[in-house]
Amino acid sequence: MTLMEDAKKGIVTPSIETVAKTEGIDPETVCSCVAKGLIAIPVNNRRETLPIGIGKYMSTKINANVGTSRDYVDIDAEIKKAKAAEAFGAHAVMDLSTGGNLDEIRTRILKSVNIPVGTVPIYQAAASRKVVVEMTSDDMFNAVRKHAEQGVDFVTVHAGVNLNSLERLRQSDRIMNVVSRGGSFTLAWMLHNGEDNPFYAEFDYLLEIAKEYDMTLSLGDGMRPGCIADASDRPKFMEFITLGELVKRARAANVQTFVEGPGHVPLNEIELSVRGMKELCNGAPLYLLGPLVTDIAPGFDHITGAIGGAVAGMHGTDFLCMVTPSEHLALPTLEDIKEGLLVTKVAAHTIDLIKEGPRERAWEKDLAMAYARRDLDWEKQFELAIDGNRARKIRDARKTESDTCSMCGELCALKIVKEAFEKKNSEE
């Protein structure tokens, strides 16, 4: 049985128990939400994975993308990135490799981390042919099965890209057409072959494979906007309607899903996007890249993505895909992965401060930091900081003889007021 089947029968599995304990929520609530598809716990039955909960009442989760490109194939470097991502707090990693021995890369990444691992099988299907459009539907489904057999916990499938959404795209005024790599493969394949997307046309077969391995489907946003001018157009929302229908079919088949969301969205349209996705996709957990809130910040898109992610979290986003400083520019380095992840952790924590479920635990951290700052307890501040080592290095770089920081020294507002009160109290 799949995890969702067990949950529908009220069976609290070890994975559900682990998630409940981690999140500080009673197991029955987690079980009920898994049964309804409101929480996803991506754990392939072929792999020992640290269970994480994504969705309602869960703390905001973060994914880190790693993997080779055809220009840069260094498997050891990608393994280091995956390990670093886990060490710095990522809850999942995705192997997006397109260059080199894809089977070897994926196998090594699966062995190198304990957290859930996701992939995009169509990349391997496309790599099996000289030209992307020459891959067959068998290539696509065989890739999904291979990844499932190897223990991949969740796969992105762009099943919402179909002939209907293609027509919406043709009739639209989009500037950037399709910026999703998997979406572009699918669209090009449909145009070349004159057929509908196999992942859509044969979605029931896809569900059979996923169910056999209890593998979660991440329903990809092949029509996501690539610039803020395209943020709220018909192709995007048409895909959400389709994805919502597929979510229902997956739940009926006892296959877990979450839904991927838009890339570039201005601040004032994020609520529309996120609430629209939640409504159209029947409350499924939402997995967002960003969204990036401006197009003019290459080199700083980890920041534009964190801004968008924090706002999206106010309206229902559950799972953030971190963005690195290299976004739109190059394959990210190890340092890019660390920087992007830490910035995304800041965004995730700001979401948890207001999210039902993790809110109380998140507030405890901020309150503890407030008391540590009030008391000028630097060691406690470093302990509580998202990146305590970085905080310590900054403070140590410009030391002061006082117990304050070098910005204010003896003019520290906290110290002045504290000493003033102490003096007044001693006189009374």
From Swiss-Prot:
<comment type="function">
    <text>Catalyzes the synthesis of the hydroxymethylpyrimidine phosphate (HMP-P) moiety of thiamine from aminoimidazole ribotide (AIR) in a radical S-adenosyl-L-methionine (SAM)-dependent reaction.</text>
</comment>
<keyword id="KW-0411">Iron-sulfur</keyword>
<dbReference type="GO" id="GO:0016830">
    <property type="term" value="F:carbon-carbon lyase activity"/>
</dbReference>
<dbReference type="InterPro" id="IPR037509">
    <property type="entry name" value="ThiC"/>
</dbReference>
<feature type="binding site">
    <location>
        <position position="158"/>
    </location>
    <ligand>
        <name>substrate</name>
    </ligand>
</feature>
<feature type="binding site">
    <location>
        <position position="65"/>
    </location>
    <ligand>
        <name>substrate</name>
    </ligand>
</feature>
<feature type="binding site">
    <location>
        <position position="94"/>
    </location>
    <ligand>
        <name>substrate</name>
    </ligand>
</feature>
<dbReference type="GO" id="GO:0009229">
    <property type="term" value="P:thiamine diphosphate biosynthetic process"/>
</dbReference>
<dbReference type="InterPro" id="IPR002817">
    <property type="entry name" value="ThiC/BzaA/B"/>
</dbReference>
<feature type="binding site">
    <location>
        <position position="405"/>
    </location>
    <ligand>
        <name>[4Fe-4S] cluster</name>
    </ligand>
</feature>
<feature type="binding site">
    <location>
        <begin position="221"/>
        <end position="224"/>
    </location>
    <ligand>
        <name>substrate</name>
    </ligand>
</feature>
<keyword id="KW-0949">S-adenosyl-L-methionine</keyword>
<dbReference type="GO" id="GO:0008270">
    <property type="term" value="F:zinc ion binding"/>
</dbReference>
<dbReference type="GO" id="GO:0009228">
    <property type="term" value="P:thiamine biosynthetic process"/>
</dbReference>
<feature type="binding site">
    <location>
        <position position="260"/>
    </location>
    <ligand>
        <name>substrate</name>
    </ligand>
</feature>
<feature type="binding site">
    <location>
        <position position="412"/>
    </location>
    <ligand>
        <name>[4Fe-4S] cluster</name>
    </ligand>
</feature>
<keyword id="KW-0784">Thiamine biosynthesis</keyword>
<feature type="binding site">
    <location>
        <begin position="180"/>
        <end position="182"/>
    </location>
    <ligand>
        <name>substrate</name>
    </ligand>
</feature>
<feature type="binding site">
    <location>
        <position position="328"/>
    </location>
    <ligand>
        <name>Zn(2+)</name>
    </ligand>
</feature>
<dbReference type="Pfam" id="PF01964">
    <property type="entry name" value="ThiC_Rad_SAM"/>
</dbReference>
<protein>
    <recommendedName>
        <fullName>Phosphomethylpyrimidine synthase 2</fullName>
        <ecNumber>4.1.99.17</ecNumber>
    </recommendedName>
</protein>
<keyword id="KW-0408">Iron</keyword>
<keyword id="KW-0456">Lyase</keyword>
<comment type="similarity">
    <text>Belongs to the ThiC family.</text>
</comment>
<dbReference type="InterPro" id="IPR038521">
    <property type="entry name" value="ThiC/Bza_core_dom"/>
</dbReference>
<keyword id="KW-0004">4Fe-4S</keyword>
<feature type="binding site">
    <location>
        <position position="408"/>
    </location>
    <ligand>
        <name>[4Fe-4S] cluster</name>
    </ligand>
</feature>
<feature type="binding site">
    <location>
        <position position="264"/>
    </location>
    <ligand>
        <name>Zn(2+)</name>
    </ligand>
</feature>
<keyword id="KW-0862">Zinc</keyword>
<feature type="binding site">
    <location>
        <position position="287"/>
    </location>
    <ligand>
        <name>substrate</name>
    </ligand>
</feature>
<keyword id="KW-0479">Metal-binding</keyword>
<comment type="pathway">
    <text>Cofactor biosynthesis; thiamine diphosphate biosynthesis.</text>
</comment>
<dbReference type="GO" id="GO:0051539">
    <property type="term" value="F:4 iron, 4 sulfur cluster binding"/>
</dbReference>
<feature type="binding site">
    <location>
        <position position="123"/>
    </location>
    <ligand>
        <name>substrate</name>
    </ligand>
</feature>
